[in-house]
Amino acid sequence: MEVILKFGILGFGAIFGYLFGEVDLLVKVLVCFIVADYISGLLASGYLGELSSKMGFKGIAKKIAILILVAIAHQIDLILGTHNTTRDAVIFFYLANELISILENFVRMGMKVPEVLKNLILIFDAKSGEDEEKHDKDMD
């Protein structure tokens, strides 16, 4: 049984590496942001008495969609020979998106959000090639 588990983990790692490329810091941080956003969404919904399994499923579907888009971006980089340029831009875009959502979840619970975290959204947007100004008003 232990051998089967080890081969399963090895197979998962190989597939993950093929789909997403090197599991570098950007990929790890994206996964952390995705998990943090989902958990903060659950906390905010629970805090407000709005927990719903349907909404939870939609949240998981969106997180899987993010990972699919990152995998597609990596495959495009392989075709173009651009060494993760597209993948990294997509990751930075979703880092900004996830951070916005995390901060909005805390605001929903009545918490104040540090300016330094709001400013990171602009940095992530710049690194993704996106220019988004609408996020400031959502967190005041």
Swiss-Prot record:
Pfam families: Phage_holin_4_1. The chain crosses the membrane at residues 4-21, 26-48. The keyword Membrane applies. The keyword Oxidoreductase does not apply. InterPro entries: Phage_holin_4_1. Its main location: membrane. It comes from the Bacteria. It is found in: Cell membrane. One of its GO terms (cellular component) is plasma membrane. Keywords: Cell membrane, Membrane, Transmembrane, Transmembrane helix. It is a multi-pass membrane protein. Belongs to the bacteriophage holin family. Cp-1 holin subfamily. This is Uncharacterized protein Lmo0128.
